[in-house]
Design a protein with these regions (language model features):
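A short beta-strand-to-loop transition that corresponds to the Sensor-1 phosphate-sensing loop
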Residues: 31-34, 41-45, 65-67, 77-78, ...
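Structural preference for long, well-ordered alpha-helical segments in enzyme cores
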Residues: 1-5, 9, 13-16, 20, ...
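Conserved helicase C-terminal RecA-like lobe
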Residues: 145-157, 170, 177-371
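Conserved helicase NTPase motor core
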Residues: 1-50, 65-69, 268
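Helicase P-loop NTPase motor core
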Residues: 56-59, 64-158, 181-185, 239, ...
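Short glycine-/polar-rich loops that comprise or flank the Walker A/P-loop
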Residues: 23-26, 32-34, 55-60, 98-102, ...
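Accessory N-terminal region flanking or inserted into the helicase ATPase core
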Residues: 1-2, 11-16, 29, 39, ...
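Short alpha-helix plus adjacent loop in nuclease-associated cores
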Residues: 34-41, 68-69, 161-184, 196
Length: 371
């Protein structure tokens, strides 16, 4: 019985392995406790850490020679991973050359970091040192891609998100931007229709179709037809479900002269219960979506700080410039943006590790966890 990537096995798989190999002990596992990164999927690190206790007659062979990396990279990796508690001692080495030294740069803000990476990539490509496709930017969470996407678009650097979607194409971002568009002028029927049932208000497809018919017959926008729902005889009592949505939008509009875009976003999130629903889900995906929402608020704050007279319309225009550009070059020569989890097993000539901050890389939850 052979098991690969043993550090990623879960408790149920371990029990199955014990049952299958219990009698004859004809078991060979290959794994590396230093590469255990899938706890959120149920992986149990103790399966590999306690292997010799479960199978005391096992022969352990350390595979410490590395064929991919340079010695400088391995020295840095060895120095970092040596701080892990309870790991199986090992030190990687290679017969490859020492290679370039790892460059360390510290920045005041995430924007400065993304700006540096964009300029450095452009410089190296112009000098013929690398192609765009040789470069990768790695980060801890998908929410961190936003700053790099915006800087790359501004600098005309082709890029591709691997293992995810572009920041402004993510569901929660499109939902909140649709709210902002509706509050701004409500002329965008697609935006209004997107959020009419976000969160769920129990307004059925038939009702929405009849509202659209009324709008078409009377030359109205979809939102203005919603405002007149009580006059649409064909929808009956469903108008009572529409009223709270219209009142919410009108209430937000009345606050526009007095609050900033970031404050408006927070009001929308609070009034709709958007984040509360995600918190109740209590999943890894929900956590990522909440991080994306925080990043959108950060984008709004950055916009407000950079403009003398920030407005909701101005913010939406700035976002549209970024969101509407398809930045993947058909030549396939593009910079790759991805999380560390997506990057496992891949290699690139030029790699940028972004956001290496306390509480972010590794995550705050990982630092505080007992195991």
């Amino acid at each position: 019985i052979m098991v690969d990537e043993y550090q990623d096995t879960n408790t149920a798989q371990f029990q199955l392995i014990k049952l299958l190999a219990g009698k004859y002990k004809n078991l060979c596992v290959v794994g590396d406790d230093d590469q255990s990164i899938y706890k959120f999927r149920g992986a149990n690190i103790y399966n590999i850490l306690n292997f010799e206790k479960e199978f005391p007659n096992a022969v352990t062979i350390k595979l410490e020679q590395n064929y991919r990396s340079t010695q400088n990279i391995l020295n840095a990796a060895n120095g970092v991973i040596a701080n892990n508690v309870g790991r199986k001692a090992k030190r990687l080495w290679t017969e490859n050359e020492e290679g370039e030294k790892i460059a360390f740069h510290q920045f005041e803000t995430g924007f400065d970091e993304a700006d540096y990476v964009a300029k450095d990539i452009r410089s190296k490509v112009r000098e013929g040192m690398y192609h765009y496709g040789d470069c990768a930017v790695l980060y801890r969470t998908n929410a961190q891609s936003r700053l790099f996407e915006e800087r790359f678009i501004t600098a005309s650097i082709p890029y591709k998100i691997v293992g995810g979607v572009n920041f402004y194409s993510r569901r929660e971002i499109k939902d909140l931007l649709a709210y902002l568009k509706t509050i701004d002028n409500a002329m965008d029927d697609l935006a209004v229709r997107r959020i009419i049932n976000v969160p769920k208000r129990g307004i059925g497809a038939t009702t929405l179709s009849r509202v659209q018919d009324y709008a078409d017959e009377n030359g109205l926008t979809f939102y203005n037809a919603l405002k007149m729902a009580e006059e649409i005889g064909t929808i009956g009592r469903a108008s009572a479900k529409i009223r709270p949505f219209v009142m919410l939008i009108q209430s937000m509009r009345s606050k526009l002269p007095y609050i900033s875009v970031s404050e408006l976003l927070q009001e929308i999130i609070e009034e709709t219960g958007y984040v509360r629903e995600l918190e109740a889900e209590n999943t890894e995906e929900a956590q990522q979506r909440m991080e994306n929402i925080d990043e959108l608020i950060s984008k709004a704050v950055t916009y407000e700080e950079s403009e003398e007279e920030p407005t909701l319309s101005g913010f939406l225009e700035e976002v549209a410039l970024v969101a509407d550009i398809d930045s993947v070059d058909e030549t396939q020569d593009y910079v790759v943006l991805m999380t560390l989890h997506s990057a496992k097993g891949l290699e690139f000539p030029q790699v940028y590790l972004a956001g290496m901050e306390d509480g972010l890389f590794p995550g705050f939850g990982a630092i505080c966890a007992e195991n």
